[in-house]
């Protein structure tokens, strides 16, 4: 007998809406169990999805999705949404090759009107859809669901300020799962929320506003303030949103369908807006291990449902993020000017390690990359040595600040760029594909890439020593190569690479951790009679011009390899060769970069193979440059 009999009858939300209202709770309970079971098989973001099971069910029951547009901010919490919207049969393919995305994705379903993965975009996108509806004479609803972490970012407030000024009929649901704004206050809160979302109250409020326009300004202002304070006193937490022009409803218990359903129905039927519904939920709701340790169950690998034990693979080498964190601790122990900054990702970047040693010198600024960069710039003006540790994909959000506030002023902000290159299961939205290109075009920037974990130690020490300009070191997600680690970092000579293996026919110049694949390729090429030099560039800016020219002069073929897009390291090498007249027939130059597409999720190894950046592809590229036939399937590499 099925454990999910009602859920089994639901193919789309149309089926859900055919059920009686007293059956909705059972659907939610079964949906939670299905979510737990699915993620135990696939891994993925877990706690946030469990926290919005009732909210997801209620939204799809009350609103006419997909005609009514439903936007999930970030998308971590969208797994239950996917199950209810025709994707249950594929839910156990989450984040695997050819399977469902771990986030919302427009090309995946009509029920995903806007793709997500980075935070704080939902209100802006929702407002755009609401305005488009109004211009087209439509009547559908637009609902944006955003978490209390995401709503802290500046973009969310920019959007709310705009929406409030336009009086747009937009519904924003604030999913407060950290109790960071205000807790629900029981039955009275639920009753007042239902009252304030109802038509009678809104009509009276609008009438009051119209009367206020004809009163003397002092009296009108005091009346408005009295109404605002009375609501703030009774409801707790809504004053800011009211100031931005929203009707504030809440806080309400996001796990109580008796509270959620009537409020959503009231708001659905409203003719005015915008609304902000403040819903309080619990991460990991309904699964005891996740409720007890929400941080450990935010994102999980495969796990045993009965025990909660996650099937984590045994580590063979330290992770790059931990090497960075530990290296920064050692440098800070010698230099009290070193500080660490992260934008809501302390454990993901290794800043949590630094925080344990130096809590007073650690700053988590929240989801605020723009602020993080300029905050670091301010610290640098006063002689401090800020390390701004941000994922490559998120650093994009602070690009103007990098240019205007850091680079133009030559301020020595140190950027630790984690998750550089392809990241695997999180796919295109989280890939660190572009930082070589978007930083490489900036004057007076030192840009490094660690080829292994030992090199990262030295590059952190190098950054500490750079006091006259900004610097960046990029490194990938995951474990290092298992190389011997230095006790302390030693600053590298700026702008100088190193030769790993000497040959005379082919030169492979690597920037970053593709060095290991270059070494594999060199071994294979040697068995095929091609003497191959392997070099580690270390620096993209300033580039080791002497090394580049030497490689070009002494080899028939020069190939660059990087874990980045077009416009990055290879482009800098080609510009140097062009400047020195080395592209006039003297050397066959090839640049191996990520393909000019957004790659879908898979394992990192599979993604690099698909991108043509593994050892097999390097060997093939060499023979293509030589003009000799060499079928890819004959290349046998370990």
From Swiss-Prot:
EC numbers for this chain: 2.2.1.7
Annotated positions binding Mg(2+): 148, 177
Cited Gene3D superfamilies: 3.40.50.920, 3.40.50.970
InterPro entries linked: Dxylulose-5-P_synthase, THDP-binding, Transketo_C/PFOR_II, Transketolase-like_Pyr-bd, Transketolase_BS, Transketolase_C, Transketolase_CS
Keywords from the named record: Isoprene biosynthesis, Magnesium, Metal-binding, Thiamine biosynthesis, Thiamine pyrophosphate, Transferase
Stretches that traverse the bilayer: none
GO molecular function annotations of the record: 1-deoxy-D-xylulose-5-phosphate synthase activity; magnesium ion binding; thiamine pyrophosphate binding
Subunit-level organization: Homodimer.
PANTHER family: 1-D-DEOXYXYLULOSE 5-PHOSPHATE SYNTHASE-RELATED, 1-DEOXY-D-XYLULOSE-5-PHOSPHATE SYNTHASE, CHLOROPLASTIC
Name listed for the protein in its UniProt record: 1-deoxy-D-xylulose-5-phosphate synthase
Top-level taxonomy: Bacteria, Pseudomonadati, Pseudomonadota, Alphaproteobacteria, Hyphomicrobiales
């Amino acid at each position: 007998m099925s454990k999910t009999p009602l859920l089994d009858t639901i193919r789309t939300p149309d089926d859900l809406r055919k059920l009686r209202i007293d059956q909705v709770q059972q659907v939610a309970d079964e949906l939670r169990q299905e979510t737990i079971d699915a993620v135990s098989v696939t891994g993925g973001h877990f706690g946030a999805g469990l926290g919005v099971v009732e909210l997801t069910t209620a939204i799809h029951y009350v609103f006419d999705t997909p005609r009514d547009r439903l936007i999930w901010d970030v998308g971590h919490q969208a797994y239950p949404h996917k199950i209810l919207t025709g994707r249950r049969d594929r839910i156990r393919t989450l984040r695997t090759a050819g399977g469902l995305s771990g986030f919302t994705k427009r090309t995946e379903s009509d029920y995903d009107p806007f793709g997500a993965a980075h935070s704080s975009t939902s209100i802006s996108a929702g407002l755009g859809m609401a305005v488009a509806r109004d211009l087209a004479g439509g009547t559908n609803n637009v609902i944006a669901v955003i978490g209390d972490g995401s709503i802290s970012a500046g973009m969310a407030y920019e959007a709310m300020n705009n929406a409030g000024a336009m009086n747009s009929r937009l519904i924003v649901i604030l999913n407060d799962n950290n109790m960071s704004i205000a807790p629900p206050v029981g039955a009275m809160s639920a009753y007042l929320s239902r009252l304030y979302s109802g038509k009678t109250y809104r009509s009276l409020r609008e009438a009051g506003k119209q009367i206020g326009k004809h009163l003397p300004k002092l009296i009108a202002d005091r009346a408005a303030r009295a109404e605002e304070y009375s609501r703030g006193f009774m409801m707790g937490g809504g004053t800011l949103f009211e100031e931005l022009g929203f009707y504030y409803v809440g806080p309400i218990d996001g796990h109580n369908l008796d509270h959620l359903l009537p409020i959503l129905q009231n708001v659905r039927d409203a003719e005015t807006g915008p609304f902000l519904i403040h819903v309080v939920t619990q991460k990991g709701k309904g699964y005891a291990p996740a409720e007890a340790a929400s941080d450990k169950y935010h994102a999980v690998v495969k796990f045993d449902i009965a025990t909660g034990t996650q099937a984590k693979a045994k580590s063979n080498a330290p992770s790059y993020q931990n090497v960075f964190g530990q290296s920064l601790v050692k440098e800070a122990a010698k230099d009290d000017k070193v500080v660490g900054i992260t934008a809501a990702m302390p454990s993901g970047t290794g800043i949590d390690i630094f925080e344990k040693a130096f809590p007073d010198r650690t700053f988590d600024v929240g989801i605020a990359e723009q602020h993080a960069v300029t905050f670091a710039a301010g610290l640098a003006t006063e002689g401090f040595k800020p390390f701004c540790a941000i994922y490559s994909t998120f650093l994009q959000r602070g690009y103007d600040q990098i240019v205007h506030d850091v680079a133009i002023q030559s301020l020595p902000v140190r950027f630790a760029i984690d998750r550089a290159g392809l990241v695997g299961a999180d796919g295109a939205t989280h890939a660190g594909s572009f930082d070589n290109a978007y930083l490489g075009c900036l004057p007076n920037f030192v840009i490094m890439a660690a080829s292994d974990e030992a090199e990262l130690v030295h590059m952190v020490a190098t950054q500490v020593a750079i006091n006259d300009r900004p610097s960046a070191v990029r490194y990938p997600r995951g474990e290092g190569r298992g190389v011997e680690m230095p006790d302390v970092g030693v600053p590298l000579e700026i702008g100088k690479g190193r030769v790993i293996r000497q040959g005379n026919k082919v030169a492979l110049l690597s920037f970053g951790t593709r060095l290991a694949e270059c070494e594999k390729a060199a071994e294979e090429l040697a068995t095929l009679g091609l003497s191959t030099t392997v070099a580690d560039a270390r620096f993209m800016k300033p580039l080791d011009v002497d090394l580049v020219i030497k490689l070009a002069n002494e080899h028939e073929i020069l190939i660059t390899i990087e874990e980045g897009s077009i416009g990055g390291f290879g482009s800098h090498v080609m510009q140097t060769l062009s400047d020195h007249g080395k592209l006039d027939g003297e050397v066959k130059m090839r640049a191996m970069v990520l393909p000019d597409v957004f790659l879908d999720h898979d394992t990192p190894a599979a993604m690099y193979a698909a991108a043509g950046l593994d050892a097999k592809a390097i060997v093939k590229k060499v023979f293509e440059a030589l003009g000799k036939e060499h079928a890819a399937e004959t290349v046998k590499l370990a």
